[in-house]
Amino acid sequence: GLLDFVTGVGKDIFAQLIKQI
């Protein structure tokens, strides 16, 4: 669903932020 898509994108962005720190 759309919520799953948004959650997936959010997790991807969060993972990228963790890698940058």
UniProtKB/Swiss-Prot annotation:
Tissue: Expressed by the skin dorsal glands.
Isoleucine amide: modified positions: 21
Alphabetical keyword list: Amidation, Amphibian defense peptide, Antibiotic, Antimicrobial, Cytolysis, Hemolysis, Secreted
GO CC aspect terms: extracellular region
Places the protein is found: Secreted
An example Gene Ontology biological process: defense response to bacterium
TM spans (from-to): none
Residues forming coiled coils: none
Main location: secreted
The protein's role, per its UniProt record: Has hemolytic activity against human erythrocytes (HC50=14.3 uM). Has antibacterial activity against the Gram-positive bacterium S.aureus ATCC 25923 (MIC=64 uM) and the Gram-negative bacterium E.coli ATCC 25922 (MIC=64 uM).
Family affiliation: Belongs to the frog skin active peptide (FSAP) family. Ocellatin subfamily.
Record protein name field: Ocellatin-4
Organism in which the protein naturally occurs: Leptodactylus ocellatus (Argus frog)
